[in-house]
Amino acid sequence: MARREEETKEFEERVVTINRVAKVVKGGRRFRFTALVVVGDKNGRVGFGTGKAQEVPEAIKKAVEAAKKDLVVVPRVEGTTPHTITGRYGSGSVFMKPAAPGTGVIAGGPVRAVLELAGITDILSKSLGSNTPINMVRATIDGLQNLKNAEDVAKLRGKTVEE
């Protein structure tokens, strides 16, 4: 039990959207709630999850559990990204550009949640195409997954960082 309590304190969670969905049946409509949640430790690990349930708190709980199972490690350089990158998912794309210290996180709603919980403090971003929250979150995480730091690139090329 103690281990599980430590896990919950390790991550910060942020609810991006809650949506009420309806199933039409013979007797009327049956409502359920979907939740999109982003979790991160503000130290380079971030993930997202979705949950669906009859009640909002239960949907959020399911989404948090799903998010913790799907964490991504984000390389950072002095609080920003190592290089410019565009993440894509479906018809949505998110352009992310490193920024000077003190700039802050310049990003729209769902993208901001992912970047802040990943521990990025200075970045410029622009959302293009589809602006559905789930697509924006997935596009942002796609971009963050494709980031490479200088050491990785040097190793791939068989050189040292100084070269």
UniProtKB/Swiss-Prot annotation:
SUPFAM superfamilies: dsRNA-binding domain-like (SSF54768), Ribosomal protein S5 domain 2-like (SSF54211). GO terms for molecular function: rRNA binding; structural constituent of ribosome. It comes from the Bacteria. GO terms for cellular component: small ribosomal subunit. InterPro entries: Ribosomal_Su5_D2-typ_SF (IPR020568), Ribosomal_uS5 (IPR000851), Ribosomal_uS5_bac-type (IPR005712), Ribosomal_uS5_C (IPR005324), Ribosomal_uS5_N (IPR013810), Ribosomal_uS5_N_CS (IPR018192), Ribsml_uS5_D2-typ_fold_subgr (IPR014721). One of its GO terms (biological process) is translation. Residues 11-74 form the S5 DRBM domain. Keywords: Ribonucleoprotein, Ribosomal protein, RNA-binding, rRNA-binding. The keyword RNA-binding applies. HAMAP family: Ribosomal_uS5_B. With S4 and S12 plays an important role in translational accuracy. NCBIfam families: rpsE_bact. Belongs to the universal ribosomal protein uS5 family. The N-terminal domain interacts with the head of the 30S subunit; the C-terminal domain interacts with the body and contacts protein S4. The interaction surface between S4 and S5 is involved in control of translational fidelity. Part of the 30S ribosomal subunit. Contacts proteins S4 and S8. This is Small ribosomal subunit protein uS5.
